[in-house]
Amino acid sequence: MTWPTANFGDRLNEIIWPHFAPEVCASSAPGRIVGIGSLLNHRLPKDGLKYVLGSGFGHGDEPAVDGNWRVLWVRGPETAKLLKRLTGQDHRFITDGAIMLGEMYPREEKKFDVSLIPHCSACTPGAWEALTEIANSLGINLISPEQAPADVVRQISQSRKVITEALHGAIVADTFGVPWKPLARSGILHFKWVDWTSSMSLPYNPSELAYRTTWFEHDPSVPAPKRFAWRVAGMISKPLLRRQLGRLASGSAWHLSDRALVARKIAEIKEELNRFKQEIAA
C-alpha cells in the first residue's frame, strides 16, 4: 500500500513488490504490504493484517500497533526504537526496500554531470520554474520527483553525481553507486533521513537551501502584503540559491555507502522476502 501521491518515492511500491514478490501481490490471501515510504503512522487502516516490509515512521502521529501487525523489517534504527517503545518488542531493521532497484535495472551510460532532485513540495507553479531556470543556468539536470518511477531511476543512474532534497533520490543514487549530497529546508523531515542514513552507516549533514516554495508562488488567495513580501524574498533568494547550488555541484564531500554493505543489505532483504512468501503460501 501507499498514499495517493505523484511522488516517485512512494510509487516505487508499484514496481518493486510485483517484481520480487509477484505471487504475494497476486495472492487472494488477506492483508496488505506496508512497504517503501514513511507509512507507519496514524493513517494506517486499523483493520486487516499488515505486513511491514521496510517501511518507516516519519509523518503524522504514532501508529496503533496491535496483533494485526507482522513486522519483517523496518527502514532503520530510529523506526525500530519507536516500535520497541510502542510494543516493548525488538524489531529488525535492514534498510529501505528501494535498495532492491539495483537488482532490477541496469547501470546506465552517464549523460549528466550533476542532477538535482527537489522535494515533491517544490513541484508547484512558480517554484518549479525558478528551480528550472537556476538549474539550466548551472548546467544541472533537474529531475522531477513526479515523473514515472522508472524514468527517475534511469536519470539518476545516468548521473555522475546527485544533489537531492528527496530522500529516495539519495537512496536510489546510493543503490546505483552515484555519489550524492543531501539538501534540507523547512518541511523536509529530519527523522526519516536519519533513519535511513543510519541503516547504511552514513552521516546526515544536509545543506540548508535558502528558499521556500511559497516565495515563488503567485496565489491570488494570499493577502497582497504577504504576496509582496514573498515576491521580494524570492527575488533576493534566487541569486543566493544559484550560488549555493553552484558551490555544492562543484564541491567535494559527496556520500556513498560501502558496496559490501549494500550487497549484504540486499541479501538480508531477499532472505526476509523468501520467508514472507513461504508464510503467505502456507
Where are these regions (language model features)?
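Active-site anion-handling motifs in enzyme catalytic cores
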Residues: 1-282
